[in-house]
């Protein structure tokens, strides 16, 4: 029977240094809250039990835990820490949420360490289980640029971990140690249960330190171990907005490197941002200034950018998207979008379709090979295949109270400046003349022309706008025309 594993994510702290109405662990980077990153990482090692300790802002944090549980399709048990009496007390609360007979390994991590990934947790668990057949306690350690504030890892002459001394309790000699505690641990659950009840608040913080379990286990003759992590960034905590900004940039670097190693070309990583939940196909190209956010999916051989932001957008294989802002849209294979297009939620562009310069769409289903080349708004509409919408056309979908739908068939050609006053239907193969205002349905194959013959009211400007620059220009032009006409008549008379 496989050995059981539990993961405890500590998320009960107040996080006052963030100076925010939002709980610290719910601040986001790369499209997920710090808490969500921690839970996703824990889930990657497929634990038997996943527990989150909540305290401050328990309603908000608890709701976030439930949301992540839904995303992952698994149970995440919240454990309430009524009073924040230290990390040892938090784990005591978590143990109550575990089955009484659980005797596997228990990992402890924190929700404010968002860069810690499942691979690192898995490696820690493997080392914990292999050290002297099975360690009682394994602590993940690292060497930061500035160890101030971290608990120091005290080792003996043989390099074995003796204890962890919190910064506030460290002697000058101990404070000089550069190897520190990451706050990430692996425990033998049976040993942990035996030792955690012996914790004391006799320290500078008057709290129950989880770190003391390591010392107590060693004194009881159990093997303890320190596993050093070379990439310190992965276990760097986030306590304020400056650290959040640093962590955000570091996580983006990790994400971009992962995609590049998987076959994605990223021209300028310094100007490219990709959320953790984004998927990108092989041989796709991201040009400078690209942001891929939310659950965006980019197909193989697609080209995105420059200067494009896509949120929850699906882009098909081979599509090209240039200087575009898109939200909740679907772009078909080999389609072309941009520059300066705005795709709003509900937009579907079919295979090899085109949305060109200064086109805005919303709740629009545009068929394969159809084109909306430029300067057009398409809202609440269905357009068939192989149709072309002329420049400066508007789908007039709102009557001031509710919105209405327009249907344009396949192989339709509309002239520039066509107004589709919904609800209206244009049949397959129909045409519209430039400047047409469609208020009635157009039969298949018909040419729609609206308005009467053009009427010119001569000298209107001079009569109604006398003294203006327009009136002066008109008078001069008319005089020049009259002079030219007289000269022509004189020349004809001489002949």
UniProtKB/Swiss-Prot annotation:
Residues 263-495 are annotated as: N-acetyltransferase. Pathway: Nucleotide-sugar biosynthesis; UDP-N-acetyl-alpha-D-glucosamine biosynthesis; N-acetyl-alpha-D-glucosamine 1-phosphate from alpha-D-glucosamine 6-phosphate (route II): step 2/2; Nucleotide-sugar biosynthesis; UDP-N-acetyl-alpha-D-glucosamine biosynthesis; UDP-N-acetyl-alpha-D-glucosamine from N-acetyl-alpha-D-glucosamine 1-phosphate: step 1/1; Bacterial outer membrane biogenesis; LPS lipid A biosynthesis. Its main location: cytoplasm. Residues 242-262 are annotated as: Linker. One of its GO terms (cellular component) is membrane. Acetyl-CoA binds at residues 391, 397-398, 416, 434. It is an enzyme of class 2 (transferase). GO terms for molecular function: glucosamine-1-phosphate N-acetyltransferase activity; magnesium ion binding; UDP-N-acetylglucosamine diphosphorylase activity. Residues 467-495 are annotated as: Disordered. Residues 468-479 have a biased composition (Low complexity). Residues 1-241 are annotated as: Pyrophosphorylase. Residues 480-495 have a biased composition (Basic and acidic residues). It catalyses: alpha-D-glucosamine 1-phosphate + acetyl-CoA = N-acetyl-alpha-D-glucosamine 1-phosphate + CoA + H(+); N-acetyl-alpha-D-glucosamine 1-phosphate + UTP + H(+) = UDP-N-acetyl-alpha-D-glucosamine + diphosphate. It is found in: Cytoplasm. Binds 1 Mg(2+) ion per subunit. UDP-N-acetyl-alpha-D-glucosamine binds at residues 10-13, 24, 81, 86-87, 151, 166, 181, 239, 344, 362, 377, 388. Homotrimer. This is Bifunctional protein GlmU. The lineage of its organism: Bacteria, Bacillati, Actinomycetota, Actinomycetes, Mycobacteriales.
